[in-house]
């Protein structure tokens, strides 16, 4: 684990490995911010055991980097694997369940508070 997380605000490339090297964080965080530009915030997220996240104030896209499991979004439950894309609109209750120990996702927060409206 690195003592000082690095954000790749000036780089044009980051790898899942670079994010995972910074986890867990100093306070046992399971996510790390690796890129910011305008409204876009990119994180690597790798929960262990359970996924404690709560609804977020911005739209959120996930790209599964590794592992398998189930994504629960409201009343909808879907299986996922590496390479899959998942989406949760701002304010929607969502979580990962039954995921493998190696599970990790790219997280992309974007747009205004309250999410984009169609």
Where do the language-model regions lie?
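A short, N-terminal "cap"/entry segment at the start of jelly-roll beta-barrel domains
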Residues: 1-44, 49-54
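Short, conserved beta-strand element in jelly-roll/cupin
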Residues: 56-71
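A structure-centric signal for secondary-structure junctions around beta-strands
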Residues: 39, 58, 102-103
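Short acidic-glycine-tyrosine-enriched beta hairpin
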Residues: 75-90
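Short strand-coil-strand connectors
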Residues: 36, 72-76, 99
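Ligand-binding loop in jelly-roll beta-barrel domains
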Residues: 90-116
């Amino acid at each position: 684990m690195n003592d000082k997380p690095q954000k790749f605000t000036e780089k044009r490339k980051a790898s899942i490995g670079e994010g995972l090297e910074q986890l867990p964080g100093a306070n046992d965080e399971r996510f790390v911010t690796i890129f910011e530009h305008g409204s876009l915030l990119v994180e690597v997220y790798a929960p262990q055991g359970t996924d404690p996240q709560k609804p977020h104030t911005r739209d959120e896209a996930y790209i599964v980097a590794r592992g398998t499991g189930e994504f629960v979004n409201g009343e909808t439950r879907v299986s996922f694997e590496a390479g899959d894309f998942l989406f949760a609109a701002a304010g929607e209750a969502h979580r990962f369940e039954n995921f493998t120990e190696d599970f990790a996702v790219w997280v992309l927060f974007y747009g205004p508070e309250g999410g984009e409206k169609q």
